[in-house]
């Protein structure tokens, strides 16, 4: 096997793609800052107990594990940054009020989450801690849609769900944990035969309501059907009210309600949202409320947030990241060096052609050039090549 090959679903990021990813990363982090979010940089690896705290079985399967040569304990390479940020909020910052945090960094997965999907996503996201009200969820939803807009993605569809609906139904009669897992999978895939089989032993009202959930999918009018057809439980009413409020604050995004899309049920504790764009089968961003994550660190706090994979978003973003640059000849002239240094100090990209090498027209858009006039070096428009 050639020694330059990389593991399956792992790839280098080449200059053109890296420029685009970095442009989007800067745009989004700058956007988060305008909302008051503070940047944190958690480590790439942690003790496995910390990485997997309060996250459920799925993240355990995704996490690379190895033995720490210093302590002998098992450590993991992070597969999700969200639990790390929850640890920072709960244990390190230890603030009493609202905390807004954001992050951007690579994560590693033992298996790809789908076809042609990298095992090294570049995860970027934002979290609010300390406010249990729907206002925090509304802000996160708004920020997620603004981040996708900053990436140039139009015609975004927002899918909304609320784990409180199923939680209220399951509270009516106990369901074994292993059956719950199968139940969630059947709901997510809308597998009606499997769902009927799994709920066969439940009380009739509970069984019928759970089997109804996959059909409660579509526009905002689904909420009215859900109110009419689901049991009149206070928790269900509150969940539907929350979804109606989120839908009303979706801006220009189309809204779908899907009361069976319960991926991450064990992790989330309230509203869940996912953003889709035309031509892409999977969600480009996901978020929701997860109030229980901080419990493992001794300090449960209300929490809500979203994240996305920058590499995936960059692959579908129309943003052009080919930077404008100034071309300069190679010369030992001190005045030229002074002119170049002055331009670079203002943020301009100035590239000198090395002797015998033409400028790289592919990687940069040379729209200007440094030319000598009367003993001075001045910036002039660059004439297009014939």
From Swiss-Prot:
Pathway: Amino-acid biosynthesis; L-histidine biosynthesis; L-histidine from 5-phospho-alpha-D-ribose 1-diphosphate: step 1/9. This is ATP phosphoribosyltransferase regulatory subunit. PANTHER family: HISTIDINE--TRNA LIGASE, MITOCHONDRIAL-RELATED, HISTIDYL-TRNA SYNTHETASE. This function is generally fulfilled by the C-terminal part of HisG, which is missing in some bacteria such as this one. Required for the first step of histidine biosynthesis. May allow the feedback regulation of ATP phosphoribosyltransferase activity by histidine. Belongs to the class-II aminoacyl-tRNA synthetase family. HisZ subfamily. One of its GO terms (molecular function) is histidine-tRNA ligase activity. It comes from the Bacteria. The keyword Amino-acid biosynthesis applies. Heteromultimer composed of HisG and HisZ subunits. Its main location: cytoplasm. One of its GO terms (biological process) is histidyl-tRNA aminoacylation. It comes from Ralstonia nicotianae (strain ATCC BAA-1114 / GMI1000). The keyword Signal does not apply. Keywords: Amino-acid biosynthesis, Cytoplasm, Histidine biosynthesis. NCBIfam families: hisZ_biosyn_reg (TIGR00443), PRK12292.1-1 (NF008935), PRK12421.1 (NF009086). Gene3D superfamilies: Bira Bifunctional Protein, Domain 2. GO terms for cellular component: cytoplasm. It is found in: Cytoplasm.
